[in-house]
Amino acid sequence: MKRPTRFFGLHAHSGFSTFDGLGYPQEHINFCLDNGLDGWALTDHGHMNGFAHAYLHAEKLRKAGANLKFIPGCEMYVHPDLELWQAQYEIKKAAKKGDKSAIKAIIDAHEHLRTKLVAIVDGDDETVNLDTEGANLTIENEEETKSSKFYDPIKRRHHLVVLPKTSEGLRRLFGLVSQGYMDGFYRFPRVDYKMIKEAAKGGHLMISTACIGGPLAYEAFSRLQGYEFDRLTPELLNDKSIFEAVQSGVGNTIDQLVDAV
């Protein structure tokens, strides 16, 4: 393989991504310089607490003559529709109490979401124990985001890497991160596609699909319940029906992402 003449890393976690990254941002930047990278983006999970560390170190090195571009970013926790999630959450609480009239009232109040809400009520998805499911957990849990064995619409979240293209984009990214904590927090700070679409107006943000915790991988996993990741590719290649089912879901998700940005 021909060695690339330029390389710019757009997805990295420092020690500020608890249990998912190591080292201070300064150490990452030094590594990039020592190994000839042209640039580096810091994309910690759900927040930008490492931004000041990285920015000040990158500026110090730039003034000393170093040629490395730093981009601040965030690997955000995303739910497709937080309004839908809130209604699902209220239905779960009512179902736990056996309050069918409350469930009907919730569905009636969200007429435009009726089909999806009825599917949740009639489905056999995991019922969350709202007393013990760990509302204070704010560290990355790979068993929930990177496994085909897990599916629960209440705990559902995906990863998306969001990067600013301009100074205005950086301002909007800060706002988006804050919005996740103020308006979308449930165990993790979450945003939805509507929030991203609003922040991305004017082309100020770049979005990537992140890792196997991203929405595209989720669509594949949700159709392959019980599969270990290392079985995924062989099964997709050997069974056309599985491949077509996965492609259908992935296609719908791609449409959502494109519409959002």
Predicted regions: what is each one?
Residues M1-V261:
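Phosphodiester-processing cores and adjacent nucleic acid-binding clamps
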